Amino acid sequence: MSAMPNTSSISVSAAFDAHRPLTLTYIDNPSTKHVIVGMSGGVDSSVSAVLLQQAGFVVEGLFMKNWEEDDGTEYCTAMDDLADAQAVCDKIGIKLHTANFAMEYWDRVFEHFLAEYKAGRTPNPDILCNKEIKFKAFLDYALTLGADYIATGHYTRRSVNYKNNDGIEVAQLLRGLDNNKDQSYFLHAVGGDKLAKTLFPVGELEKPVVRQIAEEHDLITANKKDSTGICFIGERRFKDFLQQYLPAQKGDIVTDDGINIGTHDGLMYYTLGQRGGIGIGGVKDRPEEPWFVLAKDLDNNRLIVGQGHEHPMMLSNELHAYKLDWTDGLPPTDIFSLEGLRCMAKSRYRQPDQACRVFAVNADGSEVRVIFDEPQRAVTPGQSAVFYIEEVCLGGGVIASIDAPCGF
């Protein structure tokens, strides 16, 4: 594939005209290209396999088991998902491999997940799962099977390949065409070198079209419900699951003006901006308005709450992020300038784009300071700040801290 300019060596705005989306028809001689599809047992990966097969690629599937426990009957179990994946592969006539990455998942994802909750933060394990398992362990395994590419059912796109300033062949991550389903937020930590070996067949489609294709091919997954929630929890109650691994310590619920009004079940069960499930009824001499989580006082094990959807303690103008992953492999040079990098950001999934400036706070651009044009509500440490310019996802990092106009 042709070389492309990258945002590390030229102005960011000038580079993006060259970031052409990669489509399946762009790849030469597909009949000589071996693609292994991550088959989850869902409709998106099923249709991805169909589209690749129709485009002429040599296609096989691989089902990943990332979690050993499978003791529930109220949610779709791994065995059910495997059966559906096998049924789809049988239907379209491709081989299905299986691989167990449970040990890798525990070491690289789950232990980090527990450590973050123990530290009072709210992590997003799906982002780390994509980085460490789906686009690392799976990719590495697929390459041993002779794959030229892997493919997944994510609603995102990527550019054609180009070489960055270090001479490494990479691709840029692009938003999916379906704005309601775009998953680039969850894939921002996947390196461009991994993206260069990945195909996203449904990234050019909207969800209703994907289901229509599945129905036309009489796939068992055509009307299967989309999976929701953290992958290893399934449909189980989050609190019940977390209690198996982290002992909860009850503490006081305190208002923003210092009044004790209740008892919380453990700070790890709450997140900033949360409204429901706090366990506060009517409070004497207070208006009948909803209560929101404003802060966690870790030193004193107190949950700070207040009333008002736009309470000042929930608003912040700046955040500090660390563990930055830049898709290109190199940070945009603009973050080292006095003016910073002008771009859009999301501090949570599905949040509308927020205008901001990004400044490096260390020499390699792995930590940044983000200043928003407008105050942001309920920015949560442990979640990710992800940066965009138009359709291009530049990368992102973990939110370490925020500033707030008011403190407790």
Swiss-Prot record:
It is found in: Cytoplasm. Its main location: cytoplasm. Keywords: ATP-binding, Cytoplasm, Disulfide bond, Nucleotide-binding, RNA-binding, Transferase, tRNA processing, tRNA-binding. Residues 181-183, 348-349 are annotated as: Interaction with tRNA. GO terms for cellular component: cytoplasm. One of its GO terms (biological process) is tRNA wobble position uridine thiolation. SUPFAM superfamilies: Adenine nucleotide alpha hydrolases-like. ATP binds at residues 38-45, 64, 153. Residues 124-126 are annotated as: Interaction with target base in tRNA. The record marks 154, 383 as: Interaction with tRNA. The active site is at residues 129, 231. Its EC number is 2.8.1.13. It holds the Pfam family tRNA_Me_trans_C. It catalyses: S-sulfanyl-L-cysteinyl-[protein] + uridine(34) in tRNA + AH2 + ATP = 2-thiouridine(34) in tRNA + L-cysteinyl-[protein] + A + AMP + diphosphate + H(+). Disulfide bonds join 129-231. GO terms for molecular function: ATP binding; tRNA binding; tRNA-uridine 2-sulfurtransferase activity. PANTHER family: MITOCHONDRIAL TRNA-SPECIFIC 2-THIOURIDYLASE 1, TRNA 5-METHYLAMINOMETHYL-2-THIOURIDYLATE -METHYLTRANSFERASE. Belongs to the MnmA/TRMU family. Catalyzes the 2-thiolation of uridine at the wobble position (U34) of tRNA, leading to the formation of s(2)U34. This is tRNA-specific 2-thiouridylase MnmA. The gene is mnmA.
